[in-house]
Design a protein with these regions (language model features):
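Acidic, proline/glycine-rich intrinsically disordered inter-domain spacer in sigma factors
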Residues: 2, 8-12, 16, 78-106
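C-terminal edge and immediately downstream basic/flexible tail or linker adjoining helix-turn-helix-like DNA-binding
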Residues: 2-6, 13, 132, 149-160
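A short, charge-rich alpha-helical start-of-domain segment used by transcription regulators
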Residues: 2-27, 37, 55, 113
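Short, small-hydrophobic-rich alpha-helical interface motif
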Residues: 25, 29, 39-50, 67-68, ...
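Arg/Lys-rich amphipathic alpha helix in sigma70-family domain 2
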Residues: 52, 59, 66-86, 94
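DNA-recognition helix of helix-turn-helix
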Residues: 59, 69, 133-156
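Helix-turn-helix DNA-binding module
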Residues: 106, 110, 122-139
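A short pre-motif secondary-structure segment
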Residues: 115-119
């Protein structure tokens, strides 16, 4: 089968995946990167790449998520953003209930930020997060624990 036929065969499945999951993926990448342009570019490029690869991709949903986060990480590095990147603009921050929390999440180290966003914002299970990040469940749990501790230290304990 030539590559054109592979793309045509995969297209309906990828279109269905896009309709079902692209908005949630965009929100997760945006929460990670803090930049709506990076999020839009990363999601669009990830779906374009999975379409080009066609049936060669074993798990398109996981592949798209992993690729979108890799693209966003590359874009952040290219822009030389550091851990103290600014909070999202107010018009985009309105989609999140707690602007201070999102600002604090953006200041977490990359591994902790990715784990926290994928677990709490994208509502993904730990095993899937590990697969997306190319790590194991123990590392994800450790990053979640450290991330929560940093957030608690920064924001205080609001439970009591």
């Amino acid at each position: 089968m030539d590559s054109t036929l592979a793309v045509v065969d995969a297209q309906p499945d990828i279109e269905a995946l896009y309709r079902a999951d692209a908005d949630r993926l965009w929100r997760a990448v945006y929460a990670f990167a803090g930049d709506p342009e990076i999020a839009s570019d990363a999601v669009a490029e990830a779906y374009a790449q999975v379409l080009r690869r066609g049936s060669a991709v074993r798990d398109p949903a996981a592949w798209v998520w992993r690729t979108a986060f890799q693209i966003s990480r590359g874009a952040l590095k290219a822009r030389s953003l550091d851990a103290t990147m600014s909070a999202p603009s107010v018009d985009h921050a309105d989609t999140y209930a707690d602007h201070d929390l999102l600002t604090a999440v953006h200041q977490l180290p990359e591994g902790q930020r990715a784990a926290v966003i994928l677990f709490y914002y994208a509502d993904l299970p730990i095993r899937q997060i590990a697969d997306l990040l190319g790590t194991n469940s123990i590392a994800v749990r450790a990053n979640l624990s450290r991330g929560r501790r940093h957030l608690r230290d920064r924001l205080g304990d609001h439970d009591g």
